[in-house]
Amino acid sequence: MAMNETFGVRLRKIRKQKKMPQWKLAKKIGISQQQLCLYEADKHVPSLTIFEWICGALGVSATELLGY
């Protein structure tokens, strides 16, 4: 992860690499598309539970999503 890459940027990048639209990821994890948009815009931070669901839905590890 680039030093200036935020969680939201990383989330959006991985989601797009997986060719998953926002609405589909949001539906898979049980949140609104608007809420997912707020995560990708770095306006909100997901809870640990939602973070784990995002990792599972995208098929990535927590360290990969965090960029470590």
What are these regions (language model features)?
Residues 19-38:
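Short alpha-helical DNA-recognition segment
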Residues 41:
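Short, conserved catalytic or interaction motifs in soluble domains
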Residues 38, 67-68:
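Phosphate-coordinating loops and pocket residues in cytosolic domains that bind phosphorylated ligands
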Residues 49-64:
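DNA major-groove recognition helix of helix-turn-helix/homeodomain DNA-binding modules
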Residues 9, 19-20, 46-49:
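Residue-level signal for the short linker/turn that defines the boundary of a DNA-recognition helix
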Residues 1-17:
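A short, Lys/Arg-rich alpha-helix, primarily the initiator
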